[in-house]
Design a protein with these regions (language model features):
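Terminal targeting signals and extreme-terminal segments of soluble enzymes
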Residues: 1-149
């Protein structure tokens, strides 16, 4: 998901544990692997991304670090856009967010959203990160498809 040239065969389906039935891009983005793991699945035509907050995701005040929230929002741009990104590479060219509320260790953190416009090379996406139904982060971003040269 970084625009690199590595061979990619899509997200992997998780078959056991808490995340059985979800998909992950584990191994595709080293930074997300360090921060996550993050997961996504389709529910009634809506892409939902999620992860379980851990102590390592918290700031000094005991709440989820804003950088972790933004990393998850960036991941969510790609999961929300998954149907538009099959067989192409892409990079984030813009990501904006407004912090709305906290999460604590142990919380299930989720996101949903939509592609608001899909052009030839650009995808415009918006979404909401929440926990327990309470909003945490409103985000929007732009993804650029990278075509092989």
């Amino acid at each position: 998901m970084d625009g690199g040239n590595e061979i990619w065969d899509g997200p992997k389906l998780v078959t056991d544990g808490e995340w059985a039935g979800w998909r992950t891009w584990a191994g595709m983005d080293a930074f997300e692997d360090q921060t996550g793991p993050f997961y996504f699945r389709e529910e009634n035509g809506v892409i939902r991304s999620a992860f379980r907050a851990e102590p390592r995701h918290m700031n000094g005040g005991g709440f989820m670090h804003g950088g972790c929230m933004m990393t998850f929002a960036d991941y969510s741009l790609f999961s929300i856009s998954w149907a538009h990104l099959k067989d192409v590479r892409a990079v984030t060219v813009s990501l904006n967010g407004e912090f709305l509320g906290p999460a604590k260790a142990g919380d299930l953190v989720e996101s949903t959203g939509e592609v608001t416009k899909a052009g030839g090379s650009l995808l415009f996406v918006r979404g909401l990160v929440s926990t327990g139904g309470a909003p945490m982060l409103n985000f929007s971003g732009v993804i650029k498809k990278i075509r092989p040269r």
